[in-house]
């Protein structure tokens, strides 16, 4: 970010203690970087094995699952040390041979983690109803904790589901169009990709927290909205009155009554 600020000549009106530095001197003047520069690569893990959301799953960013980069050294997951000059494939752990290097890198990792741990896993909500993007598309890539991030998963109908954390920009009536396939394919919900498994979808459901979807319902029953599907249906559309503020959006496509196949991989949201 400091590099972007300098390149764009942006003015920051308040002090911000950035983790990084501006690389403009290196880009424009070929200046050398300080040998004391240490980087941390911390990223969300793939939710392998998780077919449902869990706030304690392996998608969480943690100190232990980070990589520290310093000159030719790589500290992997706070437990293995590699020398890239001698071992570019990172096959030989030398943490016991160079405890001094490991200690320096671990110290930096601890300091960095203490500075970010309170916000590292804070969800970033997607804004809906903004004039800047209305209508907009949500995809299963943004499900919390579980996500669909490959087209092949959509093609085969991967039996996964999650939910979106959203921020409603303005009070109003919102239209949620649930789809298995993106609009540009113009394909019925149950129609399979050539050579892939047929998934007959009979019902679509939608639930948003703190919203009264039904005027009356049986005790201990599903309280969200639902639509029966026909074989030729390409989408299921729900209209919901929402108030400004945070919400969680849940969707389902069912093979039979509440026998879920997967969530809606694509949802098109429009403030009416």
Model-derived segments and spans:
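Long, internal low-complexity/basic segments
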Residues: 94-272
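Intrinsically disordered, low-complexity polar regions and short flexible loop motifs
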Residues: 87
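C-terminal cap/loop subdomain of S1 sulfatases and analogous C-terminal strand-loop tails that border
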Residues: 1-84, 104, 119, 130-133
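Flexible lysine-rich "adenylation lid" loop at the C-terminal edge of ANL adenylation domains
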Residues: 91
């Amino acid at each position: 970010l400091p590099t972007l600020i300098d390149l764009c000549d942006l003015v920051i009106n308040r002090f911000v203690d950035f983790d990084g530095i501006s690389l403009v001197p290196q880009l424009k003047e070929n200046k050398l970087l300080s040998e004391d520069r240490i980087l941390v690569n911390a990223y969300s893990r793939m939710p392998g094995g998780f077919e449902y959301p869990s706030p304690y799953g392996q998608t969480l960013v943690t100190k232990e699952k980070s990589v520290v980069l310093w000159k030719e050294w790589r500290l992997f997951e706070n437990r293995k040390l590699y020398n890239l000059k001698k071992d570019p494939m990172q096959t030989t752990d030398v943490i016991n041979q160079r405890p001094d290097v490991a200690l320096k890198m671990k110290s930096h990792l601890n300091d960095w983690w203490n500075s970010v741990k309170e916000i590292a896993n804070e969800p970033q909500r997607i804004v809906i109803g903004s004039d800047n993007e209305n209508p907009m598309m949500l995809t299963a890539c943004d499900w919390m904790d579980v996500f669909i991030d490959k087209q092949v998963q959509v093609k085969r109908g991967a039996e996964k589901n999650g939910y979106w954390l959203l921020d409603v920009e303005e009070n109003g009536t919102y239209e949620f169009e649930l789809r298995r396939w993106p609009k540009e394919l113009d394909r019925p919900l149950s129609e399979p990709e050539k050579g892939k498994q047929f998934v007959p979808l009979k019902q679509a459901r939608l639930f948003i927290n703190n919203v009264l979807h039904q005027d009356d319902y049986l005790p201990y029953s599903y309280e969200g909205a639902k639509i029966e599907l026909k074989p030729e249906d390409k989408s299921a559309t729900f209209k919901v009155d929402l108030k400004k503020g945070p919400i969680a959006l849940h969707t389902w496509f069912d093979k039979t009554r509440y026998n879920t196949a997967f969530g809606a991989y694509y949802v098109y949201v429009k403030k009416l």
